[in-house]
Amino acid sequence: MKLNEFNNAFQTEQQCLAYIANLKENKCIRCFNFNLNTSDLKRMRCLKCNQTFSILTGTIFSRSQTSLTSWFYLIFRWINTKHGIPSTDIAKELGVTLKTAWRMTHKIRTRIAKQKPQFIVEGTVQIDEMYLSHMGFKKQGRSLVNKTLIVGIYQKTTNNLIVKVLKNAKSKNLLQFAKNHISSKCLVYTDSWKGYCDFKSVFTKHETINHQDGYVSKIGVNTNQIESVWKHIRRTFKTHIKVAKNHVHLYAKEAAYKFNKIPSFETVMLCLI
């Protein structure tokens, strides 16, 4: 959706409400009946049990004092900004407080993070880790002192990136993460970190590359693609002045979501309502 199309489509609160009503499955929140009085979308009434509720109930817009036009503008900006938007910018553009701007973007990230990634059933995948410190991303060293561990699975042919924050890079954690997202039929490429030693017990096609010997083995094993993917993740975190440790997983999921595909306005809205 282009900017002029967006501006024409969502000029008023009523236009925004109508758009949500068109996307959302409208049923009673108590008895799940579909027979509703929808003359007032902010106060719909079930014709079976008389329950009244808003079309916004259950969405990120519920009980928000911020106008829907502002919310829609933020979502449009969020979609069209590859590496995220600082809350300071949103606060200035919408004329809201920094706290309100952060809360709005946090709600979007939280909903996006709940989307289940696509399970990889076949093909070649690369698995690697990235360590986030207070100074940014640093690949060297696996010490978790003042760092957060992010593990990723990447399949180049489908451009499918899956990320997760783990407590540490021990074998049982890495193996469980891989088993949850890829089939045992996949050809798995990793580096020679000892945490991947048990992968052969599950993935019969597991190959490693020792980075002390080079970036690509003699038979072509490498993790170059996923290591280059970390640049995208790095830029996302650098967009923001500071990211709390307990929110790192949300920003990482946001970055992966945008990396996998350019989401449409409708696709994102369906996640948020």
Question: What residue spans do the PLM features occupy?
Answer:
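Residue-level recognition of single "structural anchor" positions
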Residues: 1-273
